[in-house]
Each structure stands twice: as C-alpha cells, then as structure tokens.
Amino acid sequence: MRGAYSVITALLVVASSQIAAESDYQLQVYHHDVTVAGNAVVKSLPKRYLRGSQHVHDSNEERSVYSVLASMINEGVSKMPQAAEAVEKMPQAAEAVKKMPHAATAGKKVSRVTRTGKKMTSHGANARKGPLRADFVEKMPHAAEAKEEMQRANQHDLLKAIHQADEALEKSWHPSSDTAAIRYASHGISSNVILTLKEWRKNFRGMREMAVSSEHKDIIKPIHKAFVRLCGENMDPTTIEMSHIWNMMDWNVAASPATSHRQNLVSQAQRYVLIGLRSMKKDPAVWKEWNKLSKSLRFGVLDYLLNLHYQRWVRMYNIFKRHRPDKWDVPMNDKLSLDGNTDTNSALALQTHSNKQSLYPNEPSNAAWTSKGDRFVSSKRSRRTFNGNTDTASLPSKRSKVRSSKSFVPLSTESTTFGDHSVSTKTSRVSAVAPPKRPKAHNLDVLASAATALALKDSEFVMHES
C-alpha cells in the first residue's frame, strides 16, 4: 500500500509542478513520508523549473522527462471513468458468478435445441421424398400467378433497358453537319434523326435482292465514279446503291416525297441489319456467343446498327440529290471532274439526259431548235414515259454546225431577227442538257440539241446542214 501511495504522491507533485511552471512560480520543497523510489522521482523537482530556460542546467532533459510523465497522466485520466465504472460493476460481477450454475443449465438446453434441429432436418428430407400434401397442392395455382408476375416484371425490365439504351444512344450520337438536310426539308432528309425499335414494326419490305436498274447499266460507270468522289472517304457507295437512289429521284410521289423516301431508306437500313444477322448465323460459334447476350443488349446492338446503316443511306441520298451527277456532265466541284475530258462528258450528258427529265421540272423542255435552210424551226420531240413520268427523250434528226470566233451569250427577253424571220426567246436557267459553262467551238456540234435558246452576238455565222 505504501508503494502505491508513493506513486500517487509523485504524480500529484508532477501535476502541481506543471501549474506552478506555467505561472512562473518556483516550487517549494515538500517533505513527505515516502519510500526511496518516490523520493528518487521527485528529488530534482524543487531545484529547477520544469519549463527551464537555456540558463538552467539539464533543462532540456527535464522537459523530456516531463513530457513522458504528462502523456502517462493524460492516458490515466482518460481511463479513470472506465475504471470507476468497473469498480461500480464489481457487485454485479459477483452476482453473475453466483448465477453461473444457471448458465451451465442453459448450455445444456442449447445442446438439446441443436439435436432437435437435426431431427427436424431429417424429417423435412423424408417429407420431400414422400407424396405432396393436399394443402400444398391447393397452393399450386398461386405459383402459376407468381410465374405470370415474373414474366411481366421481365418485360418491364426489358422495356426499361431498351429505353435506357435509346437514351444512351441519343446522348452519344452526333450527326454530321456536312450531310444534313439542305436548307429546307423538301431538299433533303435530315440526318439528325435517331431510329428506335418501333421502326422495326413497320414499313419493312422484305429481303428482295437489289440490282442495277436496266436503264442505268450502260451509263452508270462514269456517273458512279463521280458519285464516289462526291461522297468522299469511308462511305464507298456501290453501283447498286446509287442506282437505287437514282430511281428514287424519279418516283411519282408528289404528295409527300420526303416521307416516302425516308421510309424507303429505313427499310434499306433494316435490310442491311438482317443481312448481317444472317451472315452471323452461318458461323455456329459466333451465333452461340450472340445468343448468350441478354435480350436488352441484343436489342441495343441491333438498334445501334440500324442507325448506322440509316445514317449512311441518308448521307448518300442527300449528296446525290444535292449534286445530281446524273444531270451534269461534271460535278459542281471542279476537283471532282471526270478526268477533265469535256468532250466525252458532254456526249455522256446528252445520252443520259435523253432518258431523264429536266433539272427544273417546272420548265419542260419539249422542243428543240434545229436548223433548216437559213432559219430556225421549232420542232416537237417525241415523248416517252420513264417510271410514270412524261419526259422528253428523242434527239433532233439534224445537227447544226456553227463556226464562230465569238462565244455564245444567253438572251434576255427580247426578239432576235434572223433574216426575214424573228424568233421570240425567253431567258431561262440552264437546262439539264446544257452544262453550266460556256461551250467551246470544237464541241458545238454536240451541244446543238440544248433546250436553252442561244443567240449569236455577231453576224459572222454560217449555218450548214449536216
């Protein structure tokens, strides 16, 4: 007991020395009836400040010792409430010790419950082996109802997953501004459209094989070459695709051409997706991996592919409709000309336009100017039907040879006199059969059938019959 008392006394002295040091008050010497160990702990405290300065000998050493003691005191103080609670609970612990026999009996009861549980498990296994009870059979219809509810839940989850896939695709899709609709909706199909799974339920026309139209076989190669250059890289339109778009331009769908064309492009995109699935099915290993995917994921992949194919078709359609390589001998962009051969291109344009309608359908070109003697005579051309559209088709029977050192200049609305005969002409835009540039003298015989009336600025022209 004396040893414990000496330790407590030493701790109290250290605590009081901290208070005194903070107030710069020197500690007094206290003589206590303590043991040698206690005196050894507090022997040096009365002789120096705990927070000694540089002039005090061994002050740093004293501060280091004090820091250790202070940490010990703080730790002990923090544990004092717990110690007090432990002392208060000592009687309860004694009572718990007295009740230990009851704990032993409780342990025996636990063992009995364990043995009972094992018996119940064995009875349950035997019950499964036996016939079903009547009350259990009566509850079977509820299992069928639960199965129906599960199916509804699966359908709901599938629809939710599809909706989320549509939203994700909408956020990640950025259509190209270069191939968007041209000014007005009637001039192109918007590429800023995302198709959903609802598009699979309508307007699909089956897997009919596509081929180049018979009207295009003889003239499609140079036009396709120009169209490929117009489309640029990574699109690679085929002759079959271009022929299909070319035919769409001549459909008799005046009521809603944009809607009809869009539905056809959607159908072509669906066709390409199904062709891809059919190719996948030919490989058993790939088809097996495909079927392992969840339905929502498969629908998402198909929807994504549908949009990719549709965007490609829309861009090809808009480019073809914007530039119409079938109407002009060369594309509007000089860099995309067909090898620079204007003679060949002009002849090709005449051959092409003999079977096609004018670039401006509101201005029919049903008459051609031919030379007869020393005057111009307006002769009606024969008319043909191309996919339901009446169009000019035949070339004039005679060609006019014109020699001049001057260029042709289009007429304004006026009367032009040739000898004794006057011909009234109108200013019009360049028709489909005339290229949008000034013709040269060496290919005037090819351009004689142009529908636009041209005037000779000077009088130095000699007209000869071929």
Curated annotation (Swiss-Prot):
Domain of life: Eukaryota
GO cellular component: extracellular region; host cell nucleus
Signal sequence segment: 1-21
Ranges of Basic residues composition bias in the record: 109-121
Keywords: Host nucleus, Secreted, Signal, Virulence
Subcellular location(s) of the protein: Secreted; Host nucleus
Domain notes: The RxLR-dEER motif acts to carry the protein into the host cell cytoplasm through binding to cell surface phosphatidylinositol-3-phosphate.
UniProt function note: Secreted effector that partially suppresses the host cell death induced by cell death-inducing proteins.
Name of the featured protein: Secreted RxLR effector protein 101
Lineage of source species: Eukaryota, Sar, Stramenopiles, Oomycota, Peronosporales
